[in-house]
Amino acid sequence: LEAEISNKPGHPINLIYAKPNNQEIEETLDHIKKAQKPILVVGGELQFSKKSKVLIKEIAKKFSLPVLCTYEHQDLIDNDSIYYAGELGLRPPEPIKQNALQADLVICIGHQMNGVPNMGYTFPSDTQKFIHVLPEKNFFNKLFKTDVSIISKGENFLNKLNNTDYISNKNTDWVNECHNRYMNNKATLDIREAEDGLDFGALIDELGKQVPEDSIITNDAGNFTSWMHHRFPFKSKMKLIGSEIGAMGMGI
């Protein structure tokens, strides 16, 4: 079919990404200073930013913040980093739940906190202070009440927060506690001799030793992926590609 139209082709547009203002950064710093057990939750749109991976590492160290990655985003920080506190994935182990629920301040950047990471709408809880950073406002105060809502691209927020003068190491014990829980839980997942073949835990452990640090890892949906989620030692130079909605066949 053909038809005459009067509209002219559009021109390329420059995308404008939201940034936090000074007051929002000061509010965030104020909450960090008051918190005894703050935790950083990262995921969602941060997956598209290599710079964000660097900033997450720097922010965690600068403010002594344990880092929880949302489902399918464990590649945002080195999993052997002392700041890594685990993944908010499907049926997270009890120690990872404790890392999330024992925090008194939750700073979530890039993820809407819908679906898997909220652990059945129990996280963040009403007793936790919640700072939510998203590039648009439609998801603020929809599922959870936010104490500070910041409209900003995640990378822009991380960059501005990292450029502040405040540095804190008062949460070192909390950082160690969270990472030790993650490591101790991982150590309990013993390799077993399988009568009908190979224990997939052994396979994942060997992959973790052999794959290059800049690998692209793709995974599908299903219970078998739990081996990867619980055992694979992701590096921030890697790229993890997988579906958050559990659709079969995405790994292919």
Q: Could you say what each language-model-derived stretch is?
A:
Residues 1-34:
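Conformationally flexible catalytic loops at phosphate/diphosphate-handling active centers
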Residues 2-15, 78-79, 180-191, 236-238:
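Gly-rich Lys/Arg/Thr-decorated short loops/hinges at beta-loop-alpha junctions or inter-strand turns
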Residues 36-50, 60, 218:
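Glycine-rich phosphate/diphosphate-binding loops and the adjacent beta-loop-alpha structural elements
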Residues 179-251:
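Active-site diphosphate/adenylate-binding microenvironment
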